[in-house]
Amino acid sequence: MAVKLYRIAWQRYSAHIRTADAALVAQLGRFLDLKPGIEETEPPGAVENLITIEESDGAYRIATSDWQLRAGNRGQLLFAALEAVGQIFVYEFSGAIFHAGAFLRGNSATLFFGAPQSGKSTLGFSAWRRGLPLIGDDRVVLMDEGRRVRPFPKCVKLRLPVG
């Protein structure tokens, strides 16, 4: 398969993905509810928002200008690629991003803040199971001087209870 350059855009921000794995890019688009496009040429400054994904002998390498990691299977690859896209968006975004979750109840959003592994995803999942729309479980954005809450792209991570 030929290596192509894809663009995933959110609001006015974009991440570019260089890969031969069109199925992965389509899966990322479905997961993020964003439509990937193909770029004919690399845009100026794309190195700052470029993710390179390569496969060799069943293992995957995911790299940005700041970091790289390896994935041993397709499931790990999807979550590593989602994390890379999220990191690109975090780097470019100038709004008020919080390490928090939020769900919608009527006309209001309820935000819940917490340290990593403190139960934000579990609380969000519980709210969703009760019919409350989940806005986000790990990163949310306050906009319009706090009058609007929006999700910030990052994959949901549910952890099994210990014990």
Task: Cite the ranges covered by each PLM segment.
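A noncatalytic interaction/capping subdomain that flanks phosphate/NTP-handling catalytic cores
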Residues: M1-P116, R129-R130, V140-G163
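Conserved glycine(s) of the Walker
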Residues: S118-K120
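A conserved segment at the C-terminal end of the G1
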Residues: T122-L132
